[in-house]
Swiss-Prot record:
The keyword Ribonucleoprotein applies. It comes from the Bacteria. This is Large ribosomal subunit protein bL28. Residues 1-22 are annotated as: Disordered. One of its GO terms (cellular component) is cytosolic large ribosomal subunit. InterPro entries: Ribosomal_bL28, Ribosomal_bL28/bL31-like_sf, Ribosomal_bL28_bact-type, Ribosomal_bL28_sf. It comes from Ruegeria sp. (strain TM1040). GO terms for biological process: translation. The lineage of its organism: Bacteria, Pseudomonadati, Pseudomonadota, Alphaproteobacteria, Rhodobacterales. Keywords: Ribonucleoprotein, Ribosomal protein. One of its GO terms (molecular function) is structural constituent of ribosome. Belongs to the bacterial ribosomal protein bL28 family.
Length: 96
């Protein structure tokens, strides 16, 4: 599993630990990833994703997984999230 958010594309960053004496050593800043099951209202089922805590807040803010994926750019999404986005779009087109 890569350390990358499936919805926002957030990944590890590099930087320095800086001591009181201003000694610098390399370190990695890892994203706060969580395995979650988000409910899709259109599909009527849960979708398992590995997303960052910030992405989870963004999903809640936008009104759920369906609304988040509708506005999300395809370049930022993982292959699994892109597949779910297309399934949702297909289901919404069939309903209308």
């Amino acid at each position: 599993m890569s350390r990358r958010c499936e919805l926002t594309g957030k990944g590890p960053m590099t930087g320095n630990n800086v001591s009181h004496a201003n000694n610098k050593t390399k370190r990695r800043f890892l994203p706060n990833l969580n395995d979650v099951t988000l409910q899709s209202e259109t599909l009527g089922r849960g979708v398992k994703l590995r997303i960052s805590a910030a992405a989870l807040r963004s999903v809640d803010h936008r009104g759920g997984l369906d609304a988040f994926l509708a506005k999300a750019k395809d370049e930022e999404l993982s292959a699994a999230a892109l597949k779910v986005k297309k399934e949702i779009a297909k289901a919404q087109a069939a309903e209308a």
